[in-house]
Amino acid sequence: MSSRRLIRLAAAGTVAVALCSFAAMSAQAVEPAVKKPKGQPVTIYLTRHGETMLNALDRVQGWSDSPLTDDGRQVAEQLGAGLAEAGIDFEAAYSADMVRHWETVSLALDEVGFRGEAVRDERLREISFGKYEGGDGLEMWNDIAVELGYAHVGELFEDPAFDMGTALDAMARLNEGSGLKAETSGEVADRALAALEEIAATQSKKGGDVLVVSSGLTILSALDALGADLSEVVEGIENGAVSELVYRNGAWTVRTVNDLSYVEAGSD
């Protein structure tokens, strides 16, 4: 999931000098143009919401929604406490538009002492699972496994070549003709990155830290599109985990992925 670019710089010039006419002329140095920075650096703390009722019941939860469990609320509060302990002072905050995201960002911001409210953006919501929404999670994953040529979901997850993007694209194919919208991994990555780009570009006028609460597969798809190393993300993005993204001069750097240290610090 990484790419390398080979940049070759070559410069060639030919100077013709007429000894009779230009012997007395001196060369004038031309200073290279300095590219002006496009703005101040922005650090986005991209976070998954706390555990929900549908999470606890192992039901499929994309565009469907449910409130946080007691554990989910506690994780959101611990996240905020850990961020506050780290001295992070947020300039702005955003969340997806559903109850679980709003509860998480609100509880975390209360702990941080942020004045104001987060901005809701539907582009940050979870991938849509179409006809599988609200259904049994194991049933959906078994269907995906069979679609990809496996006998059952166990074989799918045990395959070292397992790729989440491929699995999500299979889920979208299984929804064809259902009349319900299901998204591919590329579609969810595109909308999430469009939202993050807009947030970062707006904040880059003065720079600073921004808290963004989204959902697990949306975060995973966005990180994959940014070329992040996801080899250590074995069981998906954890509830309350932070992935730190730095936006500078129109380019992204992924600093951390699936980091639970803030939740852990806030639980002490």
Segments predicted by a language model, with ranges:
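Acidic, low-complexity terminal tails and accessory targeting/binding regions
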Residues: 10-13, 23-41, 127-138, 201-209, ...
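Bacterial N-terminal signal peptides that target proteins for export
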Residues: 1-13
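Beta-strand elements within well-structured catalytic alpha/beta cores of enzymes
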Residues: 42-48, 94, 208-215
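Alpha-helix capping/helix-boundary segments
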Residues: 100, 218-219
